[in-house]
Curated annotation (Swiss-Prot):
SUPFAM superfamilies: Ribosomal protein L32e. GO terms for cellular component: cytosolic large ribosomal subunit. InterPro entries: Ribosomal_eL32, Ribosomal_eL32_arc, Ribosomal_eL32_CS, Ribosomal_eL32_sf. Belongs to the eukaryotic ribosomal protein eL32 family. One of its GO terms (molecular function) is structural constituent of ribosome. PANTHER family: 60S RIBOSOMAL PROTEIN L32 AND DNA-DIRECTED RNA POLYMERASE II, SUBUNIT N (PTHR23413), RIBOSOMAL PROTEIN L32 (PTHR23413:SF1). GO terms for biological process: translation. It comes from Thermoplasma acidophilum (strain ATCC 25905 / DSM 1728 / JCM 9062 / NBRC 15155 / AMRC-C165). Keywords: Ribonucleoprotein, Ribosomal protein. This is Large ribosomal subunit protein eL32. The keyword Translocase does not apply. The gene is rpl32e. The keyword Ribosomal protein applies.
Length: 130
């Protein structure tokens, strides 16, 4: 947990993490019926759509009430903001008090080791160090 968060931000971050665990998966209307549809969310717009009208016994619809608190939106559960890193030089611009490093998936193992070594020297938190 990031120690520089004030009490209100810590409280909101706990709420955000609890909400994230409870949040349901939103599926597209009739995603189970046709394989070609996929399950990615699409807003129901049909004139007679039961899902659009929020009738009973229907899955939940995306709504503003499912969002996390705005003060901690975009934060990692540890309380840091993530910064995507592709090479060692990008580590210099990271603020260790508020930001944590996530190494890009396109980075190979040799460069990954260099990034991890340099981030330890700079006291940076690596989220996917392995």
């Amino acid at each position: 947990m990031n120690r520089l968060l004030d009490e209100n931000q810590r409280r909101l971050l706990k709420i955000k993490n609890v909400m994230a665990r409870k949040r349901v998966e939103f599926h597209r209307q009739e995603w189970f019926r046709y394989k070609k549809l996929g399950d990615a969310w699409r807003k129901p717009r049909g004139k007679h759509s039961k899902l659009r009208e929020h009738l009973a016994r229907r899955p939940p619809v995306v709504d503003a009430g499912f969002r996390s608190p705005s003060a901690v939106r975009g934060m990692h559960p540890s309380g840091y903001y993530e910064v995507l890193i592709h090479n060692v030089n990008e580590l210099e611009s990271v603020d260790p008090r508020f930001q944590a490093v996530r190494i890009a998936s396109s980075v190979g193992s040799r460069k990954r080791q260099e990034i991890i070594k340099r981030s330890e020297e700079l006291n940076l938190k690596v989220l996917n160090g392995r």
